[in-house]
Amino acid sequence: MDILLQVNPFSSVCGFICHHPCESECRRKEIDSPVSLRQLKRFVVEHTKEHRVQSRKKAASTTGKKVAIIGSGPSGLAAAKDLALLGHQVTVFEKQQVLGGMLANAIPRYRLPLDALHEDIADILASGVEARTGCEVGKDLPFDQLRSDYDAVLISVGLAESSSLPIPGVESKGVLLGIPFLWDTANGFAPEIGDRVLIVGGGNVAIDVARTAKRLGPSTVYMACLESRKEMPAWKWEIEEAEEEGIVIMNSWGPKAILHQDGKTCGIEFKRCTRVFDENRRFSPQYDESEITTVEVDSVILTIGQRANLEFIKGTPVAVDGGRLVFDRETLKTSEAGVFASGEVITGPGSAVQAVATGHNAARVIDHYLKTGEVMKLEPTTLETIGELPKKTADKAKKFDRVEVGLSAAAERVKDFAPIERAYTESEALAEARRCLACATGAVLDPKALCAGCLTCVRVCPFGVATVDQTAFMPAQECLTCGLCAAECPAAGIRLGRFATNNMKEGINLILEKMDVSRISRPFVVSYCCLYETTSRKYLRPQTEKEIEESGILRIMAPCVGRLGSLDLLAPFELGADKVMVIACKEHGCFYTGAEELLGRRIKGVRQFLDELKVGQNNLLFFPTTGSAEESWPQLWEEARKAAAQADAAQSGS
């Protein structure tokens, strides 16, 4: 949770509404489908609420600099938190009575419950950010005064107003604008829309408007847009969900006139749109005026674009051109020194997580400006990438279905504004997390290792990744971190960047050296358990000393017991264990092809060695999980302890 909040102060919000661009980059998609990162993050957020509250801490104002932020959407508040943590005194000015901007006042509640937003805002305010709600800059407080009172100003007002259309009939009763419609509905003032409603627009806001309208009870809701189905700017899954709810989408139609009778809307006339963009992808619609259609409706909601209300800077040195704020993309500065901008007011319509990103950038340039008096250019963010997963590797990987929670039934969800998607259960989250390939953390040859080029790694790699040219080499973009080469390497020279098991002895010793080993119930069993078989956090939590003493079981969770090397299997005996158990996945259930067979061979070899040491091969036990870990493991532990007790009794009797 701490990691999530470091990069995204709106982690709760994004758990519900993020369009998850990270998933489209997930290399798991080359095997089956991407890991559900949004749902996993939501699970983390929803199960760490107490920790989150306890971790809140006010940052000290150490720089003596004051920053004013106009607008409390995700960009403004993200910048506010960053600047507060950097030691600046930050005040957010919001003309509405609540913080959150469009998140609080326009995003439908079926998509974003207010509780999630309030959690994020509480974190931000706890960092030391001051908020003045119900204060409209330009009306309650002149912009020039604000500028003189603060060392820097950030304009982050978003795009809170809807654009209209210059067509006949647009002034008729029953013609509404999309953003005000969402705003009124979210705040409990839903307008009368009649039995038949048509939304003009094809973007995500239009989808929100259509689905919101559907929940107000009309029998028919239409969406009409210039774009073809493939060209619609709305996200694919939003379009599909809207259609599931009965929204009728009319593609490639442009509004020609709104029809009315006695001043009241009664229909809308369309002309066929034959092209939306020209050859340079500029908006340049063309129509076939000979193809006309008319739809009878009681109301029309226009959702064809958004704009910012910049009246508060009218007559100030902050330049506006054609209704748009003038700013420098490299520095985010406006035409007035010390005044910067972020969020949709400069980027245009986007997602919450994109707005957060511009807020982070704004905080960086403002912090630099306050400390140096100079304007900093934002360098393009370049992240090191590992490249696509090669097909030859993907084809050899086991497929595991993505864990989908699905939505509530369409017929039920349109009845109210209750959230339509539940979170993962604990078992679902663990199952989905297991699908992660741990990219770029795979096998690497220790430069100090005495690699003999024996080809063991080549023989055991289930993905055909390892190669040997004098020494072993595992390409990072191909390795899927199974760890089998590390477990089998006779020189013990291969390391894993993540999930390594070559320090098991050290880990067990750290636990035992804090205990009075003589108090542990005998026989003392060290049990290596496959982490991937857990369906709850029960066995992911560290054991207490009392639990170990009373049960006689020290549980060691291994991320795939197939990674355990021979030394890992022997180490517990050296540290005083009477028995060692290895509990693997269900039969044929291992994530990695061949891991079970190789582990079995390893155990056989160690057992022979135990006989030679007079320890006895029967003291190394191997079991597959027979059901859920929570049900089967205690039974297996009990069996092992009983068998050990019987063996000890028999030995004493002889």
Residue positions per predicted region:
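A conserved FAD-binding loop/helix module that cradles the flavin
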Residues: 209, 342-373
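FAD-site-proximal beta/loop scaffold in flavoenzymes
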Residues: 171-194, 278-349
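N-terminal Rossmann-like FAD-binding beta1-loop-alpha1 element of flavoenzymes
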Residues: 66-91, 206-214
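Rossmann-like dinucleotide-binding cores of NAD(P)H-dependent redox enzymes
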Residues: 92, 96-127, 131, 183-185, ...
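Glycine-rich dinucleotide-binding loop and its adjacent helix/turn
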Residues: 44-60, 122-139, 162-216, 320-335
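Iron-sulfur cluster-binding cysteine motifs and their immediate structural context
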Residues: 1-2, 15-44, 91, 95-98, ...
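N-terminal Rossmann-like dinucleotide/flavin-binding domain of flavoprotein oxidoreductases
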Residues: 1-8, 15, 21, 40, ...
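Flanking helices and flexible, charged tails adjoining ferredoxin-like Fe-S electron-transfer domains
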Residues: 41-66, 103-104, 108-130, 139, ...
